[in-house]
Amino acid sequence: ETSLPPDISEIKHFMAEYGYSVGKEEVTFDRSSQKMYFEAEKFLTNGEMLAITKILIATRTLPQDKMNQLIEKLEEFASTKDKKRLKELVKRELYHYKPVATLCNDLIDNLYALAEAIDDKQEITITYYKMDKSRIDRRIRPLAIVFSEYYFYLIAVHETDGEWKERYYRVDRITDMIKHRTHFEVEYDSRFDEGKLKNEIQYMWPGKEQQIVFEFTGPSVQAILDRIPKSKVIKREKDKVTIQATVVHGTGIKMTLLSQGSWVKVLSPQSFVDEMKEEVEKMMERYR
């Protein structure tokens, strides 16, 4: 006869005493392997674990060693029986994983240090490398962090000529940070809304909010609606749809629409139509 470990009430008492809250628990004993398995509804399920792992790998945002460490830690929350299966399901993706280049020593440490400054409403000075590799040291007020297309971005305001202007900084290009004793206040109605920004901006190129209308003749209308969250179909015809969207005007939305090739034709506003025409003409010149 095989003796079993303490009953579930004792296990639950032990975990509660040490700060665990696991909800509905189930303990099973596998006689073939002589192992006890503990499962709880607040642990990640196998499906949840696989989904999170796949999403993490697709971001390409962390160095290889950091990605491996993070996935190994997450696997500890998966069901014990299927850890091996989960490893098998992602091992080829991890083997071929190609992270994006970063300049900072530790992206995760950077993120948390910035998050603390945001939460404490604390002014900071960052050492930052721009796209052209030039270095700047800038005193800013950090407001939010967002993730977009492989990179984390810090949204902050910077004082220029007595005015606080919004700026975006890639977190992986911040190589040093000094926290100052100066704190700032943000009125409730003036708080930065990163959710709203994410629904309107493309590729984190800044600009003013603008409503645009364009025709789309591509095979998947839903794909373009998903790519531009604040968009809707306002007219359907046999071979095309007309879409209205609220976007951040600038390079980002042009990149998105141009990526659809001849499937897109911008209808309004006229100023944006002219910008798109000019961009297409520049592209044509490169092929002449």
Ranges and model annotations:
Residues 39-129:
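Bulky hydrophobic/aromatic content
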Residues 44, 133-136, 162-164, 221-224, ...:
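Short, surface-exposed beta-strand/loop "edge" segments at domain boundaries and coil↔beta transitions
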Residues 1-55, 282-288:
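Short, basic/aromatic recognition patches that contact phosphate-bearing ligands
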Residues 37, 125, 153-155, 242, ...:
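General beta-strand recognition
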Residues 25, 32-34, 150, 172, ...:
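Beta-strand-connecting loop/turn residues
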Residues 33, 38-43, 157-160, 245-249:
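Secondary-structure transition/turn motif
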Residues 92-213:
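Core beta-strand-centered patch of the WYL/Sm-like small regulatory domain
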Residues 195-288:
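Polybasic (Lys/Arg-rich)
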